[in-house]
């Protein structure tokens, strides 16, 4: 999942940059949305990992 979130962020950066260079506001907005989605996935994955680690420590 980490790779997926990083890819979404990268894809968003590319779309946003291309949209900015070509003055395509719709593509630029799509890129911004992709970046937010990628960052949200990353935050959820990090939280999931921390919770899993905490549960594992409690089991020991």
Curated annotation (Swiss-Prot):
Domain of life according to the entry: Bacteria
Organism field: Staphylococcus aureus (strain USA300)
SUPFAM superfamilies: Hypothetical protein YjbJ
UniProt lineage: Bacteria, Bacillati, Bacillota, Bacilli, Bacillales
Family affiliation: Belongs to the UPF0337 (CsbD) family.
Gene3D superfamilies with a match to the protein in the record: YjbJ (1.10.1470.10)
Name assigned to this protein: UPF0337 protein SAUSA300_1582
């Amino acid at each position: 999942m980490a790779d997926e979130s990083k890819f979404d962020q990268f894809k968003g950066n590319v779309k946003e940059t291309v949209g900015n260079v070509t003055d395509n506001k719709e593509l630029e907005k799509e890129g911004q949305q992709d970046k937010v989605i990628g960052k949200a996935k990353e935050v959820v994955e990090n939280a999931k990992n921390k919770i899993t680690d905490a549960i594992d420590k409690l089991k020991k």
